[in-house]
Amino acid sequence: MKIYAFDVDDTLEVSGGPISIVSVGRLKPQGHIVGLNGNWAVVVQTVPLWHRIFSFVGPMEMSKDTFLNQLKTYIPADDYIMVGNIKGVSGASDDEGAANLAGWRFIKESDFAAGAR
């Protein structure tokens, strides 16, 4: 089982990114845990039945890397994957940096949209 944490802005289609909610939704039936590590309010306000796709939303009152550390500490998995932006290259947030600080594997949003898992 893998845990996927998705940034929202410039990552998911609901906020200007290339990744469809449908493609994210395909991960859960494969046995993976899927959640948000970004502007989660956009998703819960625009995606009907968002709670059937996403098992966690955050970060709340903490940095992205701290949130990832909390998830990794308490939820055992075979792989931990942050999907999002490279600051200054594909978006404004440093999701790659947060993933590196937390010891998570990183997938750039356009690579995920192209099929990288």
PLM features per residue range, with description:
Residues 92-95, 110-117:
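Short glycine/proline-centered loop/turn elements that form peptide/ligand docking sites
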Residues 2-63:
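Alpha-helical substrate-recognition element adjacent to the catalytic core
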Residues 36-38, 83-84, 110:
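Short beta-strand/turn micro-motifs composed of small residues
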Residues 32-33, 79, 105:
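Residues at the starts of beta-strands that form the adenosine-phosphate
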Residues 59-65, 111-114:
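Short, acidic/turn-prone active-site loops that include or flank metal/cofactor-
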Residues 64-92:
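Conserved Lys-Pro-Asp/Glu-containing loop-to-beta segment of HAD-superfamily phosphomonoesterases
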Residues 86-104:
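Acidic, divalent-metal-coordinating active-site segment for phosphoryl/phosphodiester hydrolysis
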Residues 103-111:
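Short, basic interhelical loop/turn and adjoining N-cap
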